[in-house]
Regions:
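Surface-exposed short loop/turn segments
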Residues: 108, 112, 116, 120, ...
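A structural "domain/chain start" motif
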Residues: 1-140, 232, 236, 240-269
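Short, Lys/Arg-enriched charge-dense amphipathic segments
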Residues: 150-162, 217-222, 261-264
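Phenylalanine-focused residue identity feature
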Residues: 6, 79, 89, 158, ...
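Generic preference for flexible, low-structure residues
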Residues: 160-164, 196, 200, 254
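Short secondary-structure boundary motifs at beta->alpha junctions and helix caps
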Residues: 189-236
Length: 269
C-alpha cells in the first residue's frame, strides 16, 4: 500500500517547483519516494495542474504549433481550445501529450480582432522566442480570455523566471479583469525566489470591434508597464537597503586587505 504521506510530499514539491525545474524535481522524487508513488493518480493530476498553473505551452502535433493551456481555455468536456488554429484537444494524464484532437468551428469576430492586436503588441514588446499566447472565446460565459505566457530560462547561469498574465473581457459590458504573476528564481550558491501576484480591473468599452480590441490591448499594456516600473523600484531598493548590508565586511580570512601599493612590491619577493 502506498504511503499517503509520500504522496502528499510529492504533490507539495511539484506544486512549489520553480519554472524550468520540474523535470529535475520529478527525477529526484522518483529516486526518493519511488515509482509507485509517482504513478498515483493524485500525483499525475498535480503534474497536470502544474502545466495549467504556469500557463505552459504544449505541442499541438496536429497543427505543428504550441498553444498555452489554462483552466480558462478548457470546456466542460475537458477539451482545451486553440481557436486560432480551429482545433480542440485533450491532454493525457499519464502521457502529458495532446490526445483526441478535433476540429472546431467556434469563432467570434471580436476574438479574431483581439488576437491580431495581441500579436502585434507582443511582437513589439516581448521576446517572441520565449513568449506564447492564446485568445479564447468562451461561448457559455460570453467572454474573451487572453493568456500571455513568458518562460525565460537560463539554467547555465542559475536563474529562471516567468511572466504570466490572464485577461478576461466581458463581451456584454466590456469590463476587463486581469491577473499578472511574475516569479523569478536565483539559485547560484543559494536559493532566492521572488513571487508577485497582482490584479487589475478596467474597461475596454468602445464603438466597433476594432476599437474594443485596441482599448483592451492598451489596458493590458498600461497594466503590465506599471508592474514593470514597480519591479524596477523594488529591485533597486533590495540592492541598496538589503542585499549590500549582507555582503561580507571582511574576507573569509578575517584580515583586511592592505591596499597600500607601496607595501605590495612583488619585485622584492
Amino acid at each position: 500500500m502506498v504511503d499517503a504521506g509520500f504522496v502528499n510530499v510529492a504533490k507539495y514539491i511539484i506544486k512549489k517547483t520553480p519554472i524550468g525545474h520540474l523535470g529535475k524535481s520529478l527525477e529526484n522524487l522518483r529516486s526518493v519516494v519511488g515509482e509507485e508513488v509517482m504513478d498515483q493518480t493524485d500525483v499525475k493530476k498535480e503534474i497536470h495542474n502544474y502545466g495549467e498553473t504556469h500557463l505552459s505551452a504544449v505541442n499541438n502535433n496536429v497543427t505543428n504549433s504550441k498553444v498555452v493551456i489554462s483552466p480558462l481555455t478548457k470546456d466542460s468536456e475537458g477539451f482545451y481550445h486553440d481557436q486560432g488554429q480551429k482545433v480542440k484537444f485533450k491532454i493525457g494524464l499519464a502521457s502529458g501529450e495532446v490526445e483526441e484532437a478535433q476540429a472546431t468551428d467556434i469563432q467570434n469576430d471580436l476574438r479574431n480582432v483581439i488576437e491580431q492586436k495581441v500579436k502585434e503588441y507582443l511582437e513589439k514588446c516581448y521576446k517572441m522566442e520565449v513568449t506564447r499566447y492564446n485568445v479564447y472565446y468562451d461561448q457559455d460565459a460570453n467572454k474573451i480570455v487572453v493568456l500571455i505566457s513568458v518562460h525565460n530560462l537560463n539554467l547555465k547561469s542559475f536563474w529562471s523566471g516567468e511572466w504570466l498574465s490572464t485577461w478576461e473581457l466581458d463581451i456584454s459590458g466590456k469590463g476587463v479583469k486581469g491577473t499578472l504573476r511574475a516569479n523569478t528564481y536565483y539559485y547560484e550558491e543559494g536559493n532566492i525566489q521572488f513571487n508577485l501576484d497582482t490584479k487589475f480591473d478596467g474597461s475596454a468599452d468602445g464603438g466597433d470591434d476594432a476599437e474594443v480590441a485596441a482599448n483592451l490591448v492598451e489596458f493590458i499594456k498600461t497594466s503590465e508597464n506599471s508592474v514593470q516600473l514597480e519591479l524596477e523600484k523594488v529591485y533597486d531598493e533590495l540592492s541598496e537597503k538589503y542585499i549590500k548590508p549582507l555582503r561580507r565586511k571582511l574576507p573569509v580570512t578575517g584580515t583586511k586587505m592592505n591596499w597600500n601599493i607601496n607595501q605590495l612590491n612583488l619585485a622584492q619577493q
